[in-house]
Regions:
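Non-catalytic, mobile gating and regulatory segments of ester bond hydrolases
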Residues: 4-7, 14-150, 154-312, 316-317
Length: 317
């Protein structure tokens, strides 16, 4: 029997082996998710590689920080850059049984300290209030021209509240001269804002603007980012950044004994998804740069043809 391949078979093989890379937006989970509603939407647009690299750097900083323990099991760390101009506020993940009690204490409690009263997850608010006295002096220090707020899991919810506190107390870090002075990252972030059980009711704009530079981050279908459930009225404070690709779901091997949606919450899997996202973003940026260069070259050639001396002179005569 002949083993020679026909041209048709070769063409089919080429099509199978030379597949176009799939973007994170195209491979994001297709399951129905109420987070897709306008007031609690997911950002599926690829972020710049610079932003993703910054996310990774701050996540590693958060994982390696030396945390200080307070009442109500609040765990925080304060660090600064070598030049002394950047402050890092870091908040630890769920660590003790009391942390779990706070996580599940999702009664909506009015929060009145930030001028605009809004209802918040009671357990997270209690922890944040126990930490706030220890960080307020650092936040108020004018030598810091940039403040990062970063937390993971339980700590991401605390970072959400800390971010608003920094926004409210340091208006100079959100001025026209320094619009990027505050940046917040919440890895595996639970919901802490209580809006309404009515899905069409949105967060007021004057409140939403406080988290314009805060990124709630989800790895694939990480279950922690879906609690407390929307049916109870809870929402994320800003659009959720989606990490990970469903065609690379096997990265959950770092937690083989957990269900997939739980394993996706593990920090090694967040790092792997960030690495994958950085690589994909760099490839996309290189492609866009090449397309821009080719378009500019084509435009220059077209312009040079129009400006050739004597062109069209015979027709004018």
């Amino acid at each position: 029997m002949s083993t020679k391949k026909t041209k048709t078979e070769d063409k089919t093989l080429d099509q199978q082996t030379e597949q176009t890379p799939v973007t994170a937006a195209e491979t994001a989970p297709k399951t129905r998710d109420l987070d897709n509603l306008p007031e609690d939407k997911i950002v599926r647009t690829p972020l710049p590689s610079k932003t993703l690299r910054d996310m990774r750097t701050q996540f590693i900083r958060c994982l390696n920080a030396k945390y200080i323990h307070t009442d109500n099991d609040g765990d925080y760390a304060i660090e600064e850059s070598r030049d002394g101009k950047t402050l890092y506020l870091l908040f630890q993940w769920t660590r003790t049984a009391y942390d779990w009690i706070s996580n599940f204490d999702f009664v909506a409690k009015p929060y009145k300290d930030m001028e605009i009263t809004w209802r918040c997850h009671r357990g997270f608010l209690r922890v944040w209030k126990s930490i706030k006295p220890f960080v307020k002096d650092a936040v108020a220090n004018p030598k810091y021209t940039k403040i990062y707020i970063c937390g993971y899991s339980h700590g991401a919810a605390i970072a959400t509240l800390a971010h608003e506190y920094v926004w409210f107390n340091r208006p100079d870090l959100r001025s026209k001269e320094n619009p990027d002075g505050i940046t917040g990252y919440g890895f595996g972030c639970p919901r802490c804002y209580f809006g309404s059980i009515l899905p069409w009711k949105k967060m007021p704009q004057e409140l939403a603007q406080r988290w314009v530079r805060f990124y709630p981050i989800r790895n694939l279908t990480d279950i922690v980012t879906h609690v407390p459930p929307r049916i109870f009225g809870f929402r994320h404070v800003a659009p959720v950044v989606q990490l990970g690709r469903t065609d690379k779901w096997q990265i959950i091997d770092y937690a083989p004994n957990f269900p997939p949606r739980v394993a996706m919450h593990c920090d090694p899997n967040y790092l792997l998804s960030l690495d994958d996202g950085i690589k994909e973003a760099q490839e996309l940026e290189a492609y866009q740069k090449e397309v821009k260069r080719a378009n500019n070259l084509a435009a220059k050639k077209a312009a040079s043809k129009k400006t050739v001396p004597g062109s069209g002179s015979k027709e004018e005569k």
